[in-house]
């Protein structure tokens, strides 16, 4: 019964997040060799050999080869952006995905040093229990003590 309930929950969430799940499935062949790191909160977390940073789309999150299971980047993606997607459903790409990828492409050109100051990233960090800190002029994530 527990397994059936889990499967029904996963299918419901997959359909609720269908647009971003489709984008994730279409992206997979371009992310290099994928290694499954974990499955938590109805989300598959993969390490991709051609990834730098991370991206979350529906039931799938992808991180760089340097990420580990306890890495803040993993938490940012799997516990932050995934929760956003689960809450927003079909609105996720409009509210988080498109603005977030645009921000990632432009923030340095716009003169910002802190990638995590944008609303999409701040909210993901809050959901994941993370905060930013500065070291040698660069911004990093850490778990809130």
Task: Give residue spans per PLM region.
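Short amphipathic alpha-helical segments and their helix-coil junctions
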Residues: 1-5, 77-80
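Metalloprotease/metallohydrolase-associated module, dominated by Zn2+-dependent proteases
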Residues: 2-36, 40, 49-50, 92-145
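Beta-strand-connecting loop/turn residues
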Residues: 42, 59-60
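Short pre-active-site segment immediately N-terminal to the catalytic Zn-binding motif
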Residues: 50-54, 61-76, 86
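Catalytic Zn2+-binding segment of zinc metalloproteases
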Residues: 79-96
């Amino acid at each position: 019964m527990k397994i059936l309930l889990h499967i029904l929950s996963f299918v419901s969430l997959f359909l609720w997040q269908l647009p971003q799940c489709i984008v994730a499935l279409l992206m997979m062949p371009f992310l290099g060799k994928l290694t499954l790191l974990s499955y938590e909160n109805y989300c598959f977390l993969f390490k991709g050999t051609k990834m730098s940073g991370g991206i979350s789309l529906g039931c799938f999150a992808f991180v760089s080869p340097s990420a580990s299971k306890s890495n803040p980047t993993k938490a940012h993606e799997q516990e932050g952006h995934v929760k956003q997607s689960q809450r927003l459903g079909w609105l996720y790409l409009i509210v988080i995905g498109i603005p977030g990828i645009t921000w990632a492409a432009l923030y340095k050109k716009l003169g910002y040093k802190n990638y995590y100051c944008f609303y999409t990233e701040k909210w993901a960090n809050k959901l994941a229990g993370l905060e930013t800190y500065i070291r040698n002029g660069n911004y990093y994530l850490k778990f809130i003590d």
